[in-house]
Amino acid sequence: MKQKAIYPGTFDPFTNGHLDVLERALTIFEEVIVVIAENSQKRALFSIEERKMMTEQIVSNVDGARVEVLAHGLLANYARDVGARAIVRGVRQVKDFEYEFQMSLLNRQLCPEITTVFLMPNVKYTYVASSIIKEVAMLGGDVSNFVHPIVLSMINDKRALCER
């Protein structure tokens, strides 16, 4: 049986840190589905369709990875429905872990057969967050070391629209 996991997030935008966690997950699982979800508590720069498109382009050459959208519903149920055995979460710092630990316990109550796997990114990405990338980029800062060129181009396009 093929070992499958999901890697959920808003990915607004998908960063090199996200890619690093995905690649680490693929050393454990044969298939990882990057699940792009909405989060009503976050203000998105990119539409869910834009995020899916950018992420698909970035991971197109990553064996074992594919991208899906979860428009609504519980993540644990989605994981079970697609046959995933695990939910992969990137953890950069203690604050991330506290939140993710709570979510892990809730998901375990909802679907006991699904486990959560916490992966730390490469140390050079521990301070990289999508929210920081967006803020720095929209203020004209150089974020090219933290995002794929596709993302950089899309951010620059958004910034140009805002400057009009």
From Swiss-Prot:
One of its GO terms (cellular component) is cytoplasm. Pfam families: CTP_transf_like. It is found in: Cytoplasm. Substrate binds at T10, K42, L75, R89. Keywords: ATP-binding, Coenzyme A biosynthesis, Cytoplasm, Magnesium, Nucleotide-binding, Nucleotidyltransferase, Transferase. Reversibly transfers an adenylyl group from ATP to 4'-phosphopantetheine, yielding dephospho-CoA (dPCoA) and pyrophosphate. Homohexamer. Belongs to the bacterial CoaD family. This is Phosphopantetheine adenylyltransferase.
